[in-house]
């Protein structure tokens, strides 16, 4: 299946405690069906002190299910993603709500 959400996409969270918030995709894990989104689903991690890093409690992003996020269109609203083949043979993604091209 083609990737509907890619690294660098602007996405909106649909469900969960961060519902309605938006952020940029940092990393996608297609086999697990999860993605990391900057500033979303933050968890506290207890970091042990090392020689080059001090210890303490740090906040970092945790993975979020791909089904709980949607690509944001030009207006910042969640949209479904479709695929189109252009005249020159390239396959590009487009927003189903507005019809605008997402990449390419």
Curated annotation (Swiss-Prot):
One GO molecular-function entry: structural constituent of ribosome
Transmembrane spans: none
GO cellular component, as recorded: ribonucleoprotein complex; ribosome
Gene3D superfamilies: 2.30.30.30
SUPFAM superfamilies: Translation proteins SH3-like domain
InterPro entries assigned to the protein according to its UniProt record, in alphabetical order: KOW, Rib_uL2_dom2, Ribosomal_uL24, Ribosomal_uL24_KOW, Translation_prot_SH3-like_sf
SMART domains reported for this sequence: KOW
One biological process term in Gene Ontology: translation
This protein's record includes keyword Nuclease: no
Pfam families referenced in this protein's UniProt entry, alphabetically: KOW, ribosomal_L24
Record key words, sorted: Ribonucleoprotein, Ribosomal protein, RNA-binding, rRNA-binding
Entry function: One of two assembly initiator proteins, it binds directly to the 5'-end of the 23S rRNA, where it nucleates assembly of the 50S subunit. One of the proteins that surrounds the polypeptide exit tunnel on the outside of the subunit.
Family: Belongs to the universal ribosomal protein uL24 family.
Database matches in HAMAP family: Ribosomal_uL24_B (MF_01326_B)
Subunit architecture: Part of the 50S ribosomal subunit.
PANTHER family: MITOCHONDRIAL RIBOSOMAL PROTEIN L24
Protein name in UniProt: Large ribosomal subunit protein uL24
Annotated gene: rplX
